Design a protein with these regions (language model features):
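Long, contiguous N-terminal structural blocks used for assembly/anchoring
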Residues: 2-118
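Acidic, proline/glycine-rich low-complexity IDRs
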Residues: 117-149
Length: 149
């Protein structure tokens, strides 16, 4: 709103209010929030480092680029039970559930920037079974699997 001062026909001051609407050229989407459980997983990723897997860098990048993904997970193998007491976390595969439209950008970033040895996609019935939803049954690029040797 914009207030202006003017005089009426009798010479008395009059206050006019002029409504002004500003429409941004780019639609403003609400900021995505990282859930508490996802923060725990990002902390685990940040603490994991081996060969070319630089967990701290990957977790930092994922936090800054949260608009590109729905969830990330670095599951461990049961061999971790043996060595966890010594502080070792045996995990070599990062799973990313991307936001639509960011699938191939995320794959390229994992390969080029973070030197994943292999990347592949989980889609169709396998993705449906893993996520427990039929919404992804007809999609080929649902979960990005990035593996480091």
């Amino acid at each position: 709103m914009m207030a202006t001062q003017s005089k009426d026909e009798r010479g008395k001051r009059r206050r006019d209010v002029k409504m002004e609407f500003i429409i941004p050229s780019e639609p403003q989407l609400p900021e995505k929030r990282i859930s508490e459980s996802q923060e725990i997983q990002l902390d685990i990723i940040a603490r994991t480092n081996f060969n070319f897997f630089k967990g701290r860098e990957i977790a930092e990048w994922l936090r800054k680029n949260h608009k590109m993904w729905r969830a990330v997970l670095l599951p461990l193998n049961f061999i971790s039970l043996r060595d966890m007491d010594d502080g070792h976390w045996h995990a070599d595969t990062l799973y990313i559930y991307p936001e639509d439209g960011y699938q191939f950008a995320l794959e390229e970033i994992m390969r080029e920037q973070f030197h994943a040895d292999e990347t592949s996609w989980i889609g169709g019935s396998r993705a449906m079974q893993m996520l427990g939803t039929s919404e992804v049954a007809d999609k080929s690029y649902v979960i990005l699997e990035a593996w480091w040797d």
